[in-house]
A protein has these predicted regions:
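Conserved core of the sugar-phosphate nucleotidyltransferase
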Residues: 1-40
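Left-handed beta-helix
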Residues: 31, 35-205
Length: 205
């Protein structure tokens, strides 16, 4: 903690000068942003920070105890959400109210509890509706205002806010929004795309 006098971007473990990672929230003076050249690639870690050190400009850091996870790829984002739901990420607690073992819900949800199958861990966001005959297999996350029609299935997946899953549709290990569905490998299917076997859309429509 204090002034940064040396900086390494992703060094090999044997060559690392410390065990601290450059991550978190960066706060820049406007003058620093003016140092970033236009029309070319310029990375914060590989270019800007070493330049600040080299020029002896005031550059400070704080050490914060938290768990850092890289989510630079779609698969990483999906995996982290699975870990959050499983309670494996430090200092991250499930929102909402736990109404059953492994099942958390937000406000004003409509769920036909006696006629749905929900196996946690699962979070169902505020204003969401789960119709009779729907099935959810966790870890799964449903954002605010989602709608699962009768006979729809959600398995180890994430529904972003206001996503509707239509009757008979199976969402398996995906991240879905009202406009697109992303597989773990990054393959993306868009709503209305020809040859698409999935049926979903905007719950507000």
């Amino acid at each position: 903690q204090g002034r940064v006098t040396s900086f390494q971007e992703k060094p090999e473990p044997a060559k690392a000068k410390s065990n601290l990672a450059s991550t978190g929230i960066y706060i820049f003076e406007p003058a620093v942003l003016e140092m970033v050249p236009s029309g070319k690639e310029f990375d914060i870690g590989s270019d800007l920070f070493p330049m600040l050190v080299q020029q002896g400009l005031p550059f400070f850091a704080q050490s914060r105890p938290f768990q850092w996870i890289d989510i630079g790829r779609v698969g990483d984002y999906w995996s982290v959400l699975q870990q959050v739901l499983a309670g494996e990420i430090a200092s991250m607690r499930m929102p909402g109210t736990q109404v059953r073992p492994g099942v958390w819900v937000g406000l004003n949800t409509r769920i036909d509890w006696d006629q749905v199958s929900i196996q946690g861990p699962v979070y169902i966001g505020s204003g969401s509706r789960i119709e009779a005959g729907a099935r959810i297999q966790g870890p799964a996350w449903l954002g605010h205002g989602c709608l699962m029609r009768a006979g729809s299935v959600l398995q180890r997946s994430v529904l972003l806010d206001y996503t509707r899953v239509d009757a008979g549709t199976v969402m398996d290990e995906v991240i879905a929004s009202p406009q697109y569905v992303v597989q773990r490998d990054g393959h993306t299917t868009y709503h209305g795309q020809e040859g698409n076997s999935l049926h979903w859309g905007d719950a507000r429509a």
